[in-house]
Regions:
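N-terminal, polar/charged subdomain of small-to-medium soluble alpha/beta proteins
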Residues: 1-88, 103-150
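A charged helix-plus-loop insertion that forms the helical arch/lid used to bind
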Residues: 87-101
Length: 150
């Protein structure tokens, strides 16, 4: 499971010209799921994201988490994060989980993160053609991979 976490002032996702979800200050999370991912991967990633200390404290030091600041989260499924580009110039998405695996894990991820943040999490629509708008804050962008925990 891979996530690109961006600290934002605000973000929204639209489908067919209609806003589906919008958030204020917090994280826009692009989430890629592969066939080998499990609930344990989602649990680890949700805990890390909720506790990630990248918001400024009173001294201007990145020392506060999304939980600490009461920030919001918007999670958008992004199968292209699982791209393999080792061979040739056209990315392969063979590692990306199919709908039968990815949809339940995506829903589990958003429910788990919502429980940790004690508030609803905004979502896109799995498999839809979406337009994502955001205003980066910092910018602060963190990439996490449950198969490569650095």
């Amino acid at each position: 499971m891979r996530a690109v976490i961006q600290r934002v002032r605000h973000a929204s996702v639209s489908i067919g010209g209609q806003v589906k979800s919008a958030i204020g200050p917090g994280f826009l999370i692009l989430l890629g799921i592969e066939a080998a991912d499990t609930h344990e991967d989602a649990d680890w990633l949700c805990r890390k994201i909720a506790a990630l200390r990248v918001f400024d404290d009173a001294d201007g030091v990145m020392n506060r988490s999304l939980i600490d600041v009461g920030g919001e989260a918007l999670v958008v499924s992004q199968f292209t994060l699982m791209a393999s580009y080792k061979k040739g110039n056209r990315p392969s998405y063979i590692r990306a989980a199919g709908h039968d695996i990815a949809i339940p894990l995506y829903e589990y991820f958003t429910q788990t993160l919502s429980g940790l943040l004690l508030q609803p999490v905004g979502t896109g629509e799995f498999g839809a053609d979406m337009q994502v708008e955001l205003l980066n804050d910092g910018p602060v962008t963190i990439c996490m991979d449950t198969k490569n925990k650095e």
